[in-house]
A protein has these predicted regions:
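An amphipathic, basic-hydrophobic helix/alpha-beta surface used to engage anionic
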Residues: 12-258
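Low-complexity, intrinsically disordered regions enriched in charged/polar residues
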Residues: 169, 260-267
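Von Willebrand factor type A / integrin I
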Residues: 1-29, 46, 263-264, 270-340
Length: 340
């Protein structure tokens, strides 16, 4: 009887050693996700991993390493990876979460994982490694420059006042003879009585307050351009707060965004800002010409740039001639000490 038991154990060991163990890694599947693809600098991001054994045999020895995106910081750890030693029964999973932060604006490619499985006796091991697909975009920080905040606050306040004064976007600019085609509600009975014939109101459909956020990337140092992105975010958050629709224009790799507002609109723009390599591809003069071509009523302009040159200020003066309101210019000045 004991002999049969020993023979059975030896046979089981041989099967595990030479049949099951070499194939174990093929039956381990990793599923993973991040709780966000767009984050603030320093925001806590959670990675969730699920390692699943889809085989009818147990996997008795697993070393499992998960590397977070390069530059990630895991609170309380010096390393940016998690290590686990475990075994998995048939059709069971190992699930866990890792929280980490990313320090600054940019695109962070997802990390990688490494799986090591071994034989029953510890003589051999097999290693599988692969990249974790996807990326996380970190948006710019909010601008904390007091002079910028003060100028911006005053200008946004002026827009709010104008909206209050002209709350109804339909204004009556005169009166015309009734032709029979106008709706009855447009007839002005008061002016009809004065004229002795039917008169209708002639209305001007004005446009509600709207804005263009214009980013100049044709000039400036890297630090000035980084600060310009921070100013763009700050301006757009203030416009969102006031429910003012805004268009975004740039002459760089950030690209453009059609007029709108709301979370989806804001997230699209923040993703563009986060992914920027700070390249400019057209002149400031070309950017201003586009603003002039696409001008519309009740439009406010926010020009964000590194300190403007004389030529750039001349281009800005051309836009001012077409604008109903004073243009808000926010220049990203960087102290040399901060740049160093």
């Amino acid at each position: 009887m004991i002999a049969f038991v020993l023979i059975g154990l030896i046979a089981a060991t041989i099967v595990i050693q030479f049949v099951i163990a070499p194939k174990a890694a093929q039956h381990l599947h990793l599923r993973y996700s991040y709780d966000t693809q767009l984050a603030e600098p320093g925001e806590t991001i959670t990675y969730t991993g699920r390692l699943f054994n889809n085989w009818f045999f147990p996997v008795l020895f697993i070393n499992f390493y998960e590397y977070m995106p390069e530059g990630a910081a895991i609170p309380g750890k010096e390393e940016s990876y998690e290590a686990h030693s475990l075994f998995l029964l048939p059709y069971r999973e190992f699930r866990h979460a890792v929280s980490f932060t990313l320090p600054r604006r940019g695109v962070y490619r997802s990390g990688k994982y490494l799986l090591q499985t071994g034989d029953f006796l510890g003589f051999r091991s097999w290693v599988t490694s692969n990249a974790i697909s996807g990326s996380i975009t970190v948006m710019p920080r909010l601008c904390t420059d007091e002079p910028i905040i003060r100028i911006l606050g005053g200008y946004i306040g002026d827009i709010s006042v104008r909206r209050f004064i002209i709350e109804d976007p339909v204004l009556t600019v005169g009166y015309l003879d009734y032709t029979g085609r106008e709706p009855m509600k447009k007839i002005s009975w008061k002016h009809s009585a004065k004229a002795g014939r039917l008169m209708v109101r002639n209305s001007d459909y004005t446009v509600d307050a709207n804005a263009v956020v214009v980013l100049n990337m044709a000039s400036g140092s890297r630090e000035e351009k980084e600060k310009s992105l921070e100013i763009v975010r700050t301006v757009c958050e203030r416009l969102e707060r006031e429910h003012i629709p805004y268009q975004f224009l740039s002459n760089g790799d950030v690209g453009n965004l059609e007029e709108g507002f709301g979370k989806k609109h804001m997230d699209q723009l923040m993703t563009k800002l986060g992914r920027s390599m700070l390249f400019g591809h057209a002149s400031f003069d070309d950017l201003i010409e586009r603003c002039i071509r696409e001008r519309k009523k009740s439009r406010s302009y926010f020009i964000i740039s590194a300190p403007l040159s004389k030529e750039e200020r001349n281009a800005l003066s051309r836009l001012q001639k077409y604008s109903e309101y004073e243009i808000c210019v926010l220049e990203a000045e960087v102290d040399q000490d901060d740049a160093d």
